[in-house]
Every structure is written in C-alpha cells, then in structure tokens.
Amino acid sequence: MALVKICGLREPAHALAAAEAGADFIGLVFAESRRRVSVDQALAIARALGEPLAAAGGGVEHIEALLQRKRPLVVGVFADADAETVNRTAEAAGLELVQLSGDEPWDLCGQLSLPILKAVKVRDGTSVEEIIAALRPGAVPLLDTDVEGALGGTGRPFDWVVAAGVARRFPIVLAGGLTPENVGEAVRRVRPWGVDVSSGVETNGVKDVEKICAFVAAVREASR
C-alpha cells in the first residue's frame, strides 16, 4: 500500500486532521517558502502528534519499522542547508525524518542523523536511465517536477511513465502535481512506495481538510 505524505503544514490542527485521515508522514518546511515554519511552530506540531521518536538513520525498512511505532512521522524539509544545521534543527523541532529538496550532494546523507528522503528533480525529457544513474545509497528518492526557482509544491506533474520505470527498480516517493482527483491513477500506474502532496490539498493557499481526507482515501482505494 502506498504511503502518504502531506507536506507544507503550518498548523497543529491541520496536522491532527492529516493524522486522523490516515497520513503516514507530515512535512514541515524549513526551506525558503510561503509554507515555511519556525522551529517553535514545528515543535508544537510535532508534539501535537505525540512524543517524537528517537529515530536513527536508515532506509525503507527502518522507516517502515518506525511507522509501526508511530504514525504519522514528522518530516523536516530542507534545501541546501549544511549537515550541522539540519541535525540541530531536527533535534530541536522533534523531527523523525528529513527531506533534502535542494541541490545537496548525495554524500551529505551520510552526515545526517535521521532517515532521509532525497528529492530528485525530473525535467521534460529526463529518461529512466538518467535518474537511476544519479541515485546513490543513503536515502529514499523523492521524484518531483523540476521547476526553475522552485523547491516543490508547484502543482506541476511530470511523466508518470518515467516514474514507473524507476519505481520498478527502486522504492520511490512520487511528487509533483498530485491531487485527490489524479492520485489514484498515479498510484495504479506508477506503484510508488509513497506519494507526496502539498498544493494539491490546498484551497487559496491554505490546507483544506476535506481535500486531505479525499487524497488519503484515493490512495488507499488505489492501493487495494
């Protein structure tokens, strides 16, 4: 069954609604963004979801083991921050995973203390082979649309045929233009390990609880 990450949350109430809907991860953005949160905001959201786990680094199996203990897990989204900043923020904010959404080198993953999702930007014309050649151990790849000047949350999809080709070889998180209306088809066609949404569950730039619930329900239905 595909896992669900609801990203860009800024309010404890929305995080609790995502948890009630059945989300597996909630994402808190520390990179420059209109969805950015402070450490204090993040800690309030994390504590609303329960006592944060002490989660050491690890891959898919480790993340799945953590989900047996607590759900949703709290993911901090960073872009081009150094390892010290990421680790310090993660500890202060009660994070359980980190997501690297900038142009970080893969070897940064070995310096981080938590499990990692690593954004891989997909341009028009990017092939399956190009993506696979760029992957390295140490993080779960999160495939997202490459939009100049944006770090995600753009609402723009990329070619799901390419995503499916990668997903046949590696567990991936699929992002980019997903909505309650199209995520079921995306899950059936790509068969990702997880899916990630931000703008697709917003109304006028604010998280919409009805859309969050509809998104999670669509993923569960398509994963049967």
Question: Where on the chain are the PLM-derived regions?
Answer:
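Conserved N-terminal beta1-alpha1 strand-loop-helix module at the mouth
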Residues: 1-224
